[in-house]
């Protein structure tokens, strides 16, 4: 009578065991050396890279350690942070043993699918909570701007969960837990794996993220043909820019633009100092623009 429930329960236990092994608790002394700070993270690579949140390690002055399930804490160091996406990468001490990395799922999260948050909320190590993906394409406000395309979940996320993985039913990472809405129940957020996949290699290779700028501000707007479809429209532009206010961005270097993040994703480090072909819809017609890309200064709080 209960076979299916027992099978489901056993499969969940196996899933949690797999993810728990590769999830870490991160601790360190604060800048004032008054006490410990704590957060979570997870193994990203076979070289010992650990992904977590920027706000977890920001302000950790010394004694930075990572601890795997059932193991002694080992030293780690920060090798890169990106405040704008609230991501950071640590490196385990040379020669320290660590479990296999978790696999990321780059297919988008699906509204309503089961998900699991793993980490150390409120210093309760090796905790897991279950929920569903309860919202997509959310914007998480931070001191450095909004984090685009984030995942909303009703899996319990509390202080200390930050930086830990949000995984699907196969144990693949679909997001990095980052925050909860303090004024509500069961509304938590995770940085989508799509963002993690773009930012983390930059942090590993360079220690920071360089972003390009087209000299415009953009926003989502409804199409003016009466259809129930949103487009990305130019909201503000500089006097010397080839864009005009109201231009609808159709593509960047022939890649279609459907979200604000599609434009941001195109403005990566390797295009800074070059030009991009941007196709816009202006007065009902397609116009091809050749736009110089300049380096955008990092945002500050």
Predicted feature locations:
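Conserved active-site neighborhood of the chymotrypsin/trypsin-like protease fold
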Residues: 2-6, 30-37, 43-126, 257-260, ...
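Protease-domain processing segments flanking chymotrypsin-fold serine proteases, especially trypsin-like
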Residues: 1-28, 33
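Interdomain regulatory linker/hinge segments that flank or connect interaction modules
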Residues: 1-6, 114, 174-221, 279-301
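PDZ/PDZ-like groove recognition
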Residues: 156, 202-269, 285-292, 296-299
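Terminal peptide-recognition signature
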Residues: 21-26, 41, 48, 52, ...
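Active-site region of chymotrypsin-like
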Residues: 22, 93-102, 128-185, 193-198, ...
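Flexible, gly/ser-rich surface segments that form the specificity/activation loops bordering the active-site cleft
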Residues: 34, 56, 100-106, 111-146, ...
């Amino acid at each position: 009578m209960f076979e299916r429930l027992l099978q489901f329960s056993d499969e969940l236990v196996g899933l949690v065991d797999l993810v728990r092994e590769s999830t870490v608790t991160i601790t360190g002394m604060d800048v004032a050396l008054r006490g410990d700070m704590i957060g979570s993270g997870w193994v990203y690579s076979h070289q010992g890279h650990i992904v977590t949140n920027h706000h977890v390690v920001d302000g950790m002055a010394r004694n930075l350690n990572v601890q795997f399930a059932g193991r002694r804490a080992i030293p780690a160091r920060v090798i890169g942070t990106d405040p704008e996406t609230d991501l950071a990468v640590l490196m385990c001490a040379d020669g320290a043993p660590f479990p296999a990395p978790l696999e990321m799922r780059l297919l988008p999260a699906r509204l309503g699918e089961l998900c699991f948050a793993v980490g150390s909320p409120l210093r309760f190590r090796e905790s897991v909570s279950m929920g569903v993906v309860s919202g997509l394409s959310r914007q998480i406000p931070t001191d450095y701007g909004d984090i685009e395309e984030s995942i909303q979940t009703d899996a319990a996320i509390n202080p200390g969960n930050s930086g830990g993985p949000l995984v699907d039913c196969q144990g693949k990472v679909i997001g990095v837990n980052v925050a909860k809405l303090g004024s509500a129940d069961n509304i938590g957020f995770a940085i989508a794996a799509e963002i993690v996949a773009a930012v983390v290699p930059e942090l590993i290779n360079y220690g920071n993220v360089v972003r390009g700028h087209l000299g415009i501000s953009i926003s989502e707007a409804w199409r003016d043909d009466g259809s129930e479809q949103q487009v990305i429209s130019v909201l503000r532009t500089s006097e010397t820019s080839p864009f005009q206010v109201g231009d609808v961005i159709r593509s960047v270097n022939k890649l279609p633009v459907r979200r604000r993040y599609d434009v941001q994703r195109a403005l990566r480090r390797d295009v800074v100092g070059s030009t991009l072909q941007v196709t816009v819809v202006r007065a009902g017609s397609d116009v091809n623009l050749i736009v110089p890309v300049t380096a955008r200064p990092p945002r500050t709080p």
